[in-house]
From Swiss-Prot:
Its main location: cytoplasm. Keywords: Amino-acid biosynthesis, ATP-binding, Cytoplasm, Histidine biosynthesis, Hydrolase, Nucleotide-binding. The lineage of its organism: Bacteria, Pseudomonadati, Pseudomonadota, Betaproteobacteria, Nitrosomonadales. PANTHER family: HISTIDINE BIOSYNTHESIS BIFUNCTIONAL PROTEIN (PTHR42945), HISTIDINE BIOSYNTHESIS BIFUNCTIONAL PROTEIN HISIE (PTHR42945:SF9). It comes from Methylobacillus flagellatus (strain ATCC 51484 / DSM 6875 / VKM B-1610 / KT). GO terms for biological process: L-histidine biosynthetic process. This is Phosphoribosyl-ATP pyrophosphatase.
């Protein structure tokens, strides 16, 4: 599975230098962080609605859109899916309460 994420992350990096007229992702990057975050909000809402409706096919479709745009956000911030996978691995085996207690105090 991470092969797909790795290939997608590589493509998203390449799109940073692409012409915004030639690529949807390049256009998102050109519009800036707020546009990317707005798109994530839209996709999250659509995923929630699909889940509420109980339509498995739409849940998968909308979650794929949400993941995709989250990967765009990560790439825009100089991060990638491996950063998230490392964090998930770090949390593996911890209870939710232990994980929360290990977070830095703000």
């Amino acid at each position: 599975m991470s092969d797909v994420l790795d290939r997608l992350a590589e493509l998203l990096e390449q799109r940073k230098s692409a012409d915004p007229q030639s690529s949807y992702v390049a256009k998102l990057y050109a519009k800036g962080t707020d546009a990317i975050l707005k798109k994530i909000g839209e996709e999250a809402t659509e995923a929630i609605i699909a889940a509420k409706d109980g339509d498995a096919e739409q849940i998968v479709y909308e979650t794929a859109d949400l993941w995709f745009h989250s990967l765009v956000m990560l790439a825009n911030a100089g991060l990638g899916p491996q950063d998230v996978l490392r964090e998930l691995a770090r949390r593996e085996g911890l209870s939710g309460l232990e994980e929360k207690a290990s977070r830095p105090v703000e």
